Amino acid sequence: MGRSLVALLVLAWGAGAQDRLPPVAAEKMTEAQRKAVADYRNLRNADLTGPPWSVLLRVPDWVVPAVEMRLHVQNRPVLPNRLTELAILIAAREWTNNYEWNAHSAAAARAGLASAVVSDVAAGRRPEHMAEDEEILYDFCAELLHNKSLSDATYARALARFGEAGVVELANLEGYYVYLSMVMNTARSPLPAGAKPQLASFPK
């Protein structure tokens, strides 16, 4: 990625990007928020420090269900990690969510997803050189996001390749990461310190 494009992305991300819902200071938390923080720590063995969890903390009862869904994706996936990460990137690209994209583009590379596929998704293009299972997954996710439904042909291909459990997991993945993207886009959640945005907004 050229320096000029990086600079444009940084400017676009920074324009009007004030964090609307920053982390709640510990001394200002309600009892319900403190309990949600403790439950989060017990589930993830980590502190609740940033988005999307710090945003969800405004409604504490949302935190644990959202974390449990994330833990399923991490620890008990139906699909291989390479396909799971591709599905997540498709959702993050659709909603231009740089926070999820930055985290999961690195995870996708570790899972074996080709860099050319990642680059094409980032640019909003259907990748040209995908494995067959990646093509089936991409078409499923893109069609569901764009058309809000699936054709019989697209559903049949996904069902034949991934089975009923895989199809349901794919729909859940897209819904879950769209949900997180909507939460963070509403809050204008910033990237971690030192991170650079990798996604430009789609033309209006």
What residues fall within each predicted segment?
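N-terminal signal peptide c-region/cleavage motif recognized by signal peptidases
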Residues: 12-14
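Sec-dependent signal peptide recognition
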Residues: 1-8
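Hydrophobic alpha-helical segments
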Residues: 17-204
